Amino acid sequence: MSRLNNLYKKMIEYDRGDPKRIQHFVKVHSFARLIGQEEYIDDHTLYILEAAAYVHDIGIHPAMEKYGRDDGKLQEQEGPAEAEKMMKQLGFEQDVIDRVSYLVGHHHTYTNIDGMDYQILVEADFLVNYFENHSETDTIKKSVKKIFKTETGIRIATEMFFPEEFQMSETWAQDGLQELDDFIEAQGIYIRQ
């Protein structure tokens, strides 16, 4: 059994009785993995990204226990130690633990994003949160424009939440050629055939 699969199972155990949290990290992991693969990140970075996607919200339970709330900053504050403890128990390498802990401690901070693993984790979390929080289309468009950087993340957000921007007429190719012909004719250019 791979360490990532063990982490997956351990997180299900950690969040037992809380299907919303389990569903959330499973979806974030799925989007993160897809975006990472489509953006051709290296295997080690993908490994870190996948681990971080599983544990990114691990600070929610300790924040609720200590403070009675679980806002993003408290998740960032409480999550790294929990992630580190779990990952050490499962035998993850220290460099992986350190980077995952950093990502857990910053995944609600959208400035100074320093790496594709961080960028993709943020995008994957947003993709899931937009749906789970029933976000307004204008809010989604603004945040995608401001925060998303990967072609894959932008494409997924657009296709999922505002597909009308991707729809083409059935005659789009013919229409494009006709527009080109009209332009050429308007310029007085004649092409010999």
Region spans (language model):
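Active-site flanking loop/helix segments enriched in acidic
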Residues: 3-27, 59-70
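Divalent metal-dependent phosphate-bond-processing catalytic cores, especially two-metal-ion Mg2+/Mn2+ enzymes
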Residues: 13-26, 30-42, 55, 92, ...
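An active-site-proximal "capping" alpha-helix that borders the catalytic cofactor pocket
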Residues: 28-31, 73-89
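Short helix-capping and hinge/turn segments at secondary-structure transitions, especially at repeat
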Residues: 37, 60-63, 84-92, 105, ...
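Acidic/histidine metal-binding catalytic segments
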Residues: 41-49, 90-104, 117
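His-Asp-centered metal-binding catalytic motifs of divalent-metal-dependent phosphohydrolases/nucleases
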Residues: 46-68, 79, 101-108, 125
